[in-house]
Amino acid sequence: MYLEQIKGELQEAADVLAKFMADEKNIQLIQEAALLIANSFKQGGKVLSCGNGGSHCDAMHFAEELTGRYRENRPAYPAIAISDVSHLSCVSNDFGYEYVFSRYIEAVGQTGDVLFGLSTSGNSKNVLNAINIAKEKGMKVIALTGKDGGQMAGLADVEIRVPHFRYADRTQEIHIKVIHILMMLIEFEMAKTA
Protein backbone atom coordinates (compact mmCIF):
# COMPACT_ATOMS: atom_id res chain seq x y z
CA MET A 1 0.00 0.00 0.00
CA TYR A 2 2.65 2.56 1.04
CA LEU A 3 5.87 0.67 0.31
CA GLU A 4 7.03 3.06 -2.41
CA GLN A 5 6.39 6.11 -0.21
CA ILE A 6 8.36 4.49 2.62
CA LYS A 7 11.26 3.71 0.29
CA GLY A 8 11.11 7.24 -1.10
CA GLU A 9 11.28 8.79 2.38
CA LEU A 10 14.23 6.63 3.36
CA GLN A 11 16.01 7.37 0.08
CA GLU A 12 15.51 11.11 0.45
CA ALA A 13 16.88 10.95 4.01
CA ALA A 14 19.91 9.02 2.75
CA ASP A 15 20.44 11.54 -0.06
CA VAL A 16 20.35 14.51 2.33
CA LEU A 17 22.85 12.79 4.64
CA ALA A 18 25.12 11.91 1.69
CA LYS A 19 25.08 15.53 0.48
CA PHE A 20 25.91 16.77 3.98
CA MET A 21 28.76 14.25 4.34
CA ALA A 22 30.19 15.08 0.91
CA ASP A 23 31.19 18.55 2.12
CA GLU A 24 34.38 18.01 4.13
CA LYS A 25 33.82 21.37 5.81
CA ASN A 26 30.84 19.89 7.68
CA ILE A 27 33.04 17.14 9.13
CA GLN A 28 35.60 19.72 10.27
CA LEU A 29 32.90 21.92 11.82
CA ILE A 30 31.52 19.03 13.87
CA GLN A 31 34.99 18.40 15.27
CA GLU A 32 35.48 22.11 15.94
CA ALA A 33 32.15 22.32 17.79
CA ALA A 34 32.95 19.29 19.95
CA LEU A 35 36.35 20.68 20.93
CA LEU A 36 34.85 24.09 21.68
CA ILE A 37 32.35 22.53 24.09
CA ALA A 38 34.90 20.22 25.71
CA ASN A 39 37.29 23.13 26.21
CA SER A 40 34.50 25.13 27.85
CA PHE A 41 33.84 22.26 30.25
CA LYS A 42 37.55 21.97 31.05
CA GLN A 43 37.59 25.68 31.96
CA GLY A 44 34.51 25.44 34.20
CA GLY A 45 31.97 26.57 31.60
CA LYS A 46 28.58 25.16 30.69
CA VAL A 47 26.33 24.72 27.66
CA LEU A 48 22.96 26.44 27.32
CA SER A 49 20.83 25.04 24.49
CA CYS A 50 17.70 26.35 22.79
CA GLY A 51 15.40 25.91 19.82
CA ASN A 52 11.71 25.86 18.86
CA GLY A 53 9.40 22.91 18.26
CA GLY A 54 11.39 19.87 17.14
CA SER A 55 14.59 21.89 17.54
CA HIS A 56 13.57 22.55 21.15
CA CYS A 57 13.30 18.80 21.66
CA ASP A 58 16.76 18.39 20.12
CA ALA A 59 18.14 21.09 22.44
CA MET A 60 16.69 19.19 25.40
CA HIS A 61 18.04 15.89 24.06
CA PHE A 62 21.53 17.38 23.79
CA ALA A 63 21.45 18.74 27.35
CA GLU A 64 20.13 15.51 28.86
CA GLU A 65 22.86 13.47 27.24
CA LEU A 66 25.47 15.88 28.59
CA THR A 67 24.10 15.77 32.14
CA GLY A 68 23.20 12.08 31.91
CA ARG A 69 25.25 9.99 29.53
CA TYR A 70 25.56 9.06 25.89
CA ARG A 71 27.22 5.67 25.47
CA GLU A 72 29.54 5.37 28.45
CA ASN A 73 29.24 6.01 32.17
CA ARG A 74 31.22 9.13 33.03
CA PRO A 75 30.94 12.30 35.12
CA ALA A 76 28.01 14.58 34.30
CA TYR A 77 28.74 17.64 32.15
CA PRO A 78 27.15 21.03 32.90
CA ALA A 79 24.33 21.69 30.44
CA ILE A 80 20.95 23.39 30.58
CA ALA A 81 18.22 23.31 27.95
CA ILE A 82 16.26 26.55 28.20
CA SER A 83 12.96 24.78 28.69
CA ASP A 84 11.57 25.75 32.10
CA VAL A 85 7.86 26.26 31.47
CA SER A 86 7.43 28.96 34.12
CA HIS A 87 10.33 30.95 32.63
CA LEU A 88 9.05 30.51 29.07
CA SER A 89 5.50 31.55 29.95
CA CYS A 90 6.60 34.48 32.13
CA VAL A 91 8.92 35.98 29.54
CA SER A 92 6.48 35.29 26.69
CA ASN A 93 3.75 37.09 28.57
CA ASP A 94 5.79 39.99 29.94
CA PHE A 95 8.29 40.63 27.13
CA GLY A 96 7.33 38.50 24.11
CA TYR A 97 8.27 35.04 22.87
CA GLU A 98 11.21 36.44 20.94
CA TYR A 99 12.99 37.02 24.28
CA VAL A 100 12.45 33.67 26.03
CA PHE A 101 16.00 32.45 25.39
CA SER A 102 17.89 35.74 25.54
CA ARG A 103 16.48 36.62 28.97
CA TYR A 104 17.68 33.28 30.31
CA ILE A 105 21.13 33.80 28.77
CA GLU A 106 21.19 37.29 30.29
CA ALA A 107 20.46 35.77 33.71
CA VAL A 108 22.80 32.76 33.80
CA GLY A 109 25.19 32.94 30.84
CA GLN A 110 28.82 33.72 31.61
CA THR A 111 32.01 34.34 29.71
CA GLY A 112 33.39 30.97 28.65
CA ASP A 113 29.97 29.30 28.41
CA VAL A 114 28.61 27.98 25.11
CA LEU A 115 25.23 28.70 23.53
CA PHE A 116 24.01 25.79 21.40
CA GLY A 117 21.19 27.18 19.25
CA LEU A 118 19.12 25.24 16.75
CA SER A 119 16.93 26.59 13.95
CA THR A 120 16.14 24.71 10.75
CA SER A 121 15.50 27.99 8.95
CA GLY A 122 18.17 30.04 10.69
CA ASN A 123 15.56 32.75 11.19
CA SER A 124 14.10 32.06 14.64
CA LYS A 125 13.98 35.49 16.26
CA ASN A 126 14.27 34.13 19.80
CA VAL A 127 17.38 32.12 18.92
CA LEU A 128 18.86 35.13 17.11
CA ASN A 129 18.28 37.27 20.21
CA ALA A 130 19.94 34.59 22.34
CA ILE A 131 22.97 34.61 20.03
CA ASN A 132 23.30 38.38 20.33
CA ILE A 133 23.13 38.34 24.15
CA ALA A 134 25.52 35.38 24.33
CA LYS A 135 28.09 37.26 22.26
CA GLU A 136 27.68 40.36 24.44
CA LYS A 137 28.42 38.18 27.48
CA GLY A 138 31.57 36.68 25.97
CA MET A 139 30.05 33.27 25.31
CA LYS A 140 30.90 31.08 22.32
CA VAL A 141 28.05 30.20 19.97
CA ILE A 142 27.38 27.01 18.05
CA ALA A 143 24.42 27.09 15.66
CA LEU A 144 22.77 24.18 13.89
CA THR A 145 20.85 25.55 10.92
CA GLY A 146 19.44 24.53 7.56
CA LYS A 147 18.71 25.91 4.11
CA ASP A 148 21.07 28.88 3.51
CA GLY A 149 21.61 29.55 7.23
CA GLY A 150 19.05 32.36 7.20
CA GLN A 151 19.76 35.34 9.45
CA MET A 152 22.05 33.19 11.60
CA ALA A 153 24.52 32.72 8.75
CA GLY A 154 27.86 34.10 9.87
CA LEU A 155 26.79 34.93 13.44
CA ALA A 156 28.02 31.83 15.27
CA ASP A 157 31.57 30.84 16.12
CA VAL A 158 30.67 27.49 14.56
CA GLU A 159 27.66 27.07 12.27
CA ILE A 160 26.79 23.57 11.12
CA ARG A 161 24.36 23.99 8.25
CA VAL A 162 22.27 21.31 6.55
CA PRO A 163 21.86 22.50 2.93
CA HIS A 164 18.31 21.19 2.54
CA PHE A 165 15.53 23.50 1.34
CA ARG A 166 12.38 21.37 1.42
CA TYR A 167 11.08 20.07 4.72
CA ALA A 168 12.36 20.81 8.23
CA ASP A 169 12.23 17.14 9.24
CA ARG A 170 15.13 16.26 6.92
CA THR A 171 17.23 19.02 8.48
CA GLN A 172 16.28 17.84 11.97
CA GLU A 173 17.33 14.29 11.08
CA ILE A 174 20.84 15.54 10.32
CA HIS A 175 20.83 17.76 13.41
CA ILE A 176 20.18 14.79 15.70
CA LYS A 177 22.94 12.81 13.97
CA VAL A 178 25.29 15.75 14.51
CA ILE A 179 24.24 15.92 18.18
CA HIS A 180 25.03 12.25 18.67
CA ILE A 181 28.44 12.61 17.03
CA LEU A 182 29.16 15.68 19.16
CA MET A 183 28.32 13.66 22.26
CA MET A 184 30.69 10.90 21.22
CA LEU A 185 33.53 13.33 20.52
CA ILE A 186 32.95 15.32 23.73
CA GLU A 187 33.12 12.10 25.75
CA PHE A 188 36.35 11.11 23.96
CA GLU A 189 37.90 14.52 24.58
CA MET A 190 36.83 14.77 28.21
CA ALA A 191 38.13 11.26 28.92
CA LYS A 192 41.64 12.52 28.05
CA THR A 193 41.63 14.72 31.16
CA ALA A 194 39.69 12.44 33.51
From Swiss-Prot:
Binding sites annotated in the UniProt record for substrate: 52-54, 65, 93-94, 119-121, 124, 172
GO cellular component: cytoplasm
Keyword terms: Carbohydrate metabolism, Cytoplasm, Isomerase, Metal-binding, Zinc
Pathway: Carbohydrate biosynthesis; D-glycero-D-manno-heptose 7-phosphate biosynthesis; D-glycero-alpha-D-manno-heptose 7-phosphate and D-glycero-beta-D-manno-heptose 7-phosphate from sedoheptulose 7-phosphate: step 1/1; Bacterial outer membrane biogenesis; LOS core biosynthesis
Chain sites annotated for binding Zn(2+): 61, 65, 172, 180
CDD domains, per the entry: SIS_GmhA
One term of GO molecular function: carbohydrate derivative binding
Family: Belongs to the SIS family. GmhA subfamily.
Note: The reaction produces a racemic mixture of D-glycero-alpha-D-manno-heptose 7-phosphate and D-glycero-beta-D-manno-heptose 7-phosphate.
Protein known as: Phosphoheptose isomerase
Source organism: Haemophilus ducreyi (strain 35000HP / ATCC 700724)
Origin organism lineage: Bacteria, Pseudomonadati, Pseudomonadota, Gammaproteobacteria, Pasteurellales
